[in-house]
Amino acid sequence: MDNVQNEIFYKKVIELFQNARKNLSAAVNMTMVYSYFEAGRIIVEKEQDGKERAAYGKYILKELSQRLTKKFGRGYSYDNLKLMRKFYLVYSKDSIGETAFPQSEKLPVTKEGRKFYLSWSHYLVLMRINKIEERHFYEIEAYKNRWSKDELTRQYGSSLYERLALSRNKEEVMRLATEGQMIEKPEDIFKDPYILEFTGLPELVTYSETELENKIIDNLQKFLLELGRGFTFVGRQVRLTFEEEHFRVDLVFYNRLLRCFVLFDLKIGQLKHQDIGQMQMYVNYYDRKVKLDDENSTIGIIICKDKKDAIVEMTLPKDNNQIFASKYETVLPSKEELKTLLEDKNLE
């Protein structure tokens, strides 16, 4: 009897992949994502239906792996089948609203009402994330920004969710999980810290500000990924001249979503109040001499190795929404440390 049931089980999964391969098209990867989910469902149902010992369940999966591999080739190893099982267990109980996704997106829907918007390699990364709100955030952002699997891995490794959440209130943090990062006001593009691990510079500062700037320019695409959506590079060491004096802004960008210039000044030491005053001058110049009437106010961001929040707060006006100061790190942050900071913040 067991052999008959096992044969039905094997045949059911094989037929699933046969049908999936008949639908090969530009959406082949998406088709396979749904097939992996359904395969996970069949495997879990087989486990729940029987009373087999764990060792026998392992034997069943290994036998299924051999049959699928013989039929279709690579991609159906025992470990991959376990990932399909995990995929079903995670996403059968994971619902996500469609407000962050195009309503016209015509995708299949699982029995649980779930749609999948990314490739299998993306979901392999997402399945590592235990916290559902954080997992939703990365799924939405990966879709919105068309992140590759490597870009998603980098953003998760740099703790983007925690860094954004630290500068937001509880309501805004919940919004991250349902809508992703919304760029509507100057504060929305701000991160603290900025992660510049792609520069390859050491954690201990043994380099100049010019070297830091050069490394950023050499890795401009990666810096743009760190900045987020809407940024376009304008120039480096952009000269401003008035009263026969020359000043230079380290990096100038334009954000298409906010419709404003964003100026960056790099400081490898501790932030001084004079640095904030200098950025205020740059911002005023752009607002009065460069931006068009229908564009929004210029934003200035000072990226420094260290800062004292009290100095920033006392130097800037209370209603400031144009100038920001953030630390930078040249190594990936500890996710545990950031999560602890976020938990402490939520208790305040």
Residue map of PLM features:
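Basic, low-complexity intrinsically disordered segments
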Residues: 1-348
